[in-house]
């Protein structure tokens, strides 16, 4: 009997056989996959160069297309630029300024477009040539604009301002068309990098032209007088013409800047300042040179300093409100000339005192002294330079000129409130102080001459020490008569004004009081003494009354005789003197006469004059 087969073993055997088959099949599959992988790798190696070449060809195609487009763009730009260049080559005169600048603007726009597009391009070498050409073309064109600008500025040639001043002709100025062209070019450059250059050209050319013009006048402005020891003649210095020309150019340049910078008002002050600064520097240097000459010879050239005051004040006035870098130079000039003019005021007073002190005796005719003539000649000189004198009154006080031995009681200005800020008031005061100084010092010398053994007591009509009041009063009044005559016939009349004339009247009244002082003493003798007797009734000592009449008669005749010696030439002084004498004598005499005329049995023996007779004598006394 065959052996019995186990079922589980049979299953294992079958499964094992199947697994072997599967393993073999898997091996075969893996083998096939390796072959496929090897084949795929070989294919990939074959296709990679082909794809790379294809990519290169695609890029090359794009580059060729881009290059063709760039070449077309460059060609278009070059053609357009070439057209503009042809126009610009014709020049401004042929093309016209407006069209010329418009073409340059278009080139500038092209350049800006190219430059702004550069950031979006990776390659720009194809535009480099046209870019460089445009930049150079614009620079050449703008250079031509500057040359054209200069040619217009230089259309006005250097000229001698004195000719225009003499003929009262305005200084040369640009035509409206030229002003329009200059403004157009300034406007073109305004706001770009070349703006400051064109402005510098304007400033430089205008300053240079004006300095060349002023050079015609400079040699004459450096001389004050051809004769070193001759007094300066008013208006003869070339500095006056130099100043007038400078003022004309300042006005001209202001108009020019206004015309050219009408749209750019904020630039006007700076541009004008730059143009004028070299002129002001040259003026200040010349001013200083003139002042140095004045200081070296104040006796002859001193009054010229007042013309310099007018000059510097006029220049500063013309520059008022304008910014000037070297305005301090003018301030320095003002300060320096002020020191000179202040010394002239002080020296005038010192000169009067010195001249008066040089008098050794009173003139035999009690007439006008050399000191008076010199003083009035000097004051007339001051009056010829009235405007300069007024200008020199800045920052000056009365103390600047008053003498060191000044005594208020001797002067006719005492404790009066005046507006010292008013230059006219100051100048009037100076003239009056000069006249007062003359009178006071003439009186002092007269007292010393007539009363050498006593200290002078001047400006005092009531002085008991002064025994020669009438003569001294007449002496001073004679000199004041000349003073007043010269005042009335010169600019001094206006310069004195109301206050000055009042002071002169007070001065005359002082010395009229001197002349009537003896008359006052005479009438004082008529003051009667009253006695009371035992009955209580008033009585008079007849002898005393007789003595009073006798003394009056003698004194009256003596004074009449003396007064007749002093013949005044001024009609107003005659009237005043006669009025003063009559007002002093007649009231007292009439009172005394009416009271005591009946005291005597024979009145005519003691009473020589009736009031009417006395009045007649007095009326004939001063004629």
From Swiss-Prot:
A GO CC annotation given for this chain: prospore membrane
Keyword Protein transport in annotation: yes
Pfam family, one: Exo70_C
UniProt keywords, alphabetically: Cytoplasmic vesicle, Exocytosis, Protein transport, Transport
GO BP term, example: vesicle docking involved in exocytosis
GO molecular function: phosphatidylinositol-4,5-bisphosphate binding; small GTPase binding
Compartment(s) of residence: Cytoplasmic vesicle, Secretory vesicle; Bud; Bud neck
Assembly and binders: The exocyst complex is composed of SEC3, SEC5, SEC6, SEC8, SEC10, SEC15, EXO70 and EXO84. Interacts with RHO3.
Additional remark text: Present with 4280 molecules/cell in log phase SD medium.
Function recorded in the entry: Involved in the secretory pathway as part of the exocyst complex which tethers secretory vesicles to the sites of exocytosis. Plays a role in the assembly of the exocyst.
Family: Belongs to the EXO70 family.
Protein name: Exocyst complex component EXO70
This protein's encoding gene: EXO70
């Amino acid at each position: 009997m065959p052996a019995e087969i186990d079922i589980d073993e049979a299953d294992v055997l079958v499964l094992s056989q199947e697994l072997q088959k599967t393993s073999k099949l898997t091996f075969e599959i893996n083998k096939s996959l390796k072959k496929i992988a090897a084949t795929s790798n070989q294919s990939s190696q074959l296709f990679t160069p082909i794809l790379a070449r294809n990519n290169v060809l695609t890029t090359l195609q794009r580059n060729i297309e881009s290059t063709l487009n760039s070449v077309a763009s460059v060609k278009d730009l070059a053609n357009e630029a070439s057209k503009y260049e042809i126009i610009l080559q014709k020049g401004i005169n042929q093309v016209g300024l407006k069209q010329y600048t418009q073409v340059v603007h278009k080139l500038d726009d092209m350049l800006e477009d190219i430059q702004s597009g550069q950031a979006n391009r990776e390659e720009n070498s194809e535009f480099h040539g046209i870019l460089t050409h445009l930049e150079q073309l614009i620079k050449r064109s703008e250079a031509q604009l500057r040359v054209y600008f200069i040619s217009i500025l230089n259309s006005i040639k250097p000229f001698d301002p004195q000719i225009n001043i003499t003929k009262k002709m305005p200084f040369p100025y640009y035509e409206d068309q030229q002003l329009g062209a200059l403004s157009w070019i300034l406007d073109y450059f305004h706001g770009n990098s070349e703006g400051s250059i064109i402005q510098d050209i304007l400033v430089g050319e205008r300053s240079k032209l004006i300095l060349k013009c002023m050079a015609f006048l400079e040699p004459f402005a450096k001389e004050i007088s051809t004769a070193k020891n001759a007094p300066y003649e008013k208006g003869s210095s070339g500095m006056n013409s130099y100043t007038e020309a400078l003022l004309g150019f300042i006005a001209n340049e202001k108009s020019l800047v206004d015309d050219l910078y009408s749209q750019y008002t904020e630039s006007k002050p700076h541009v004008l300042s730059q143009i004028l600064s070299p002129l002001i520097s040259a003026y200040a240097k010349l001013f200083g040179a003139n002042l140095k000459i004045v200081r070296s010879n104040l006796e002859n050239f001193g009054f010229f300093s007042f013309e310099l005051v007018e000059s510097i004040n006029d220049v500063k006035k013309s520059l008022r409100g304008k910014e000037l870098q070297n305005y301090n130079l003018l301030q320095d000039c003002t300060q320096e000339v002020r020191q000179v003019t202040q010394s002239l005021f002080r020296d005038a007073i010192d000169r009067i005192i010195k001249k008066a002190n040089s008098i050794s005796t009173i003139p035999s005719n009690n007439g006008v002294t050399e000191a008076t003539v010199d003083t009035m000649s000097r004051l007339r000189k001051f009056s010829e330079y009235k405007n300069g004198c007024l200008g020199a009154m800045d920052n000056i006080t009365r103390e600047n000129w008053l003498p060191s031995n000044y005594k208020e009681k001797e002067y006719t200005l005492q404790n009066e409130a005046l507006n010292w800020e008013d230059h006219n008031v100051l100048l009037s005061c100076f003239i009056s102080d000069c006249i007062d100084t003359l009178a006071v010092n003439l009186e002092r010398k007269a007292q010393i001459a007539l009363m050498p053994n006593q200290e002078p007591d001047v400006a005092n009509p009531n002085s008991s020490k002064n025994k020669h009041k009438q003569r001294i009063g007449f002496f001073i009044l004679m000199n004041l008569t000349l003073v007043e005559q010269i005042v009335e016939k010169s600019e001094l009349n206006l310069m004195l004004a109301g206050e000055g004339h009042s002071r002169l009247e007070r001065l005359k009244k002082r010395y009229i009081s001197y002349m009537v002082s003896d008359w006052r003493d005479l009438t004082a003798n008529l003051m009667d003494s009253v006695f009371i007797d035992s009955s209580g009734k008033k009585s008079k000592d007849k002898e005393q009354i007789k003595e009073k009449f006798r003394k009056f008669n003698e004194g009256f005749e003596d004074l009449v005789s003396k007064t007749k010696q002093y013949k005044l030439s001024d009609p107003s002084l005659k009237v005043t003197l006669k009025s003063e004498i009559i007002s002093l004598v007649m009231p007292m005499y009439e009172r005394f006469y009416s009271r005591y005329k009946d005291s005597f049995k024979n009145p005519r023996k003691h009473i020589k004059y009736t009031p009417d007779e006395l009045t007649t004598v007095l009326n004939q006394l001063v004629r």
